[in-house]
Amino acid sequence: DPESLRQDHEFLLGDRILSCPVTEEKADVGRTDMSQARSTWRVYLPPGTWYHHWSGTKYAGGAYHEVPAPPGSLPLFMREGLIIPTYDRAVDTFVEGVEDPAIKDMEQVDGSIEVLFHGYGEDRFTLWDGTTIHCVRRPGEAGTYTVENGHGRSYTCVFVN
C-alpha cells in the first residue's frame, strides 16, 4: 500500500501490530498541565480490518482515522484474524532467575501464555520453541483454538469483539 509508506509516525510490527505514537506538540511528555494535551491522533491504517487495542473499536483499513490518544496512551492496533501471543502483563523483567521475590521474572511468567484474537478469521502461529497455536472464529460462532507441543504451559485464548 503506497500510502502506508508515507507514514513517518507509524510502525508495523510484523504483519500483526501497528504502533502509532503521538509525535507532535501538545503530547503529554514532560507536561504538568494536561488541559492542553492532545486527546486524539490522526492515523492511517493499512488495508484490512484493524482493532484499537485499548478500546476494542473496529476500524476499516485503507483510510485515515482520528483515534483516541489520551495522555499516557499509545495508539496501538491489531490486525483482524491474526494471533497475538502475550505473556502475563505483570512481568517486571525478561531476565530469568531473579532472586528478589518482589520482582516477577521471565521464568515465572513462562508457565502461561494468553492469546489475543481480534475479530474473525483463521490463523496458525508458531512460537520460538515450536509450540503451534491455531485459532478459528467465524461470524455467528464461538471461537476455537488448539495448541500443539505446548511445553507444559497453560494457554488461554481471548476472542476480542
Tell me the role of every PLM-derived stretch.
Residues D1-S154, F159:
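Catalytic core of carbohydrate-active enzymes
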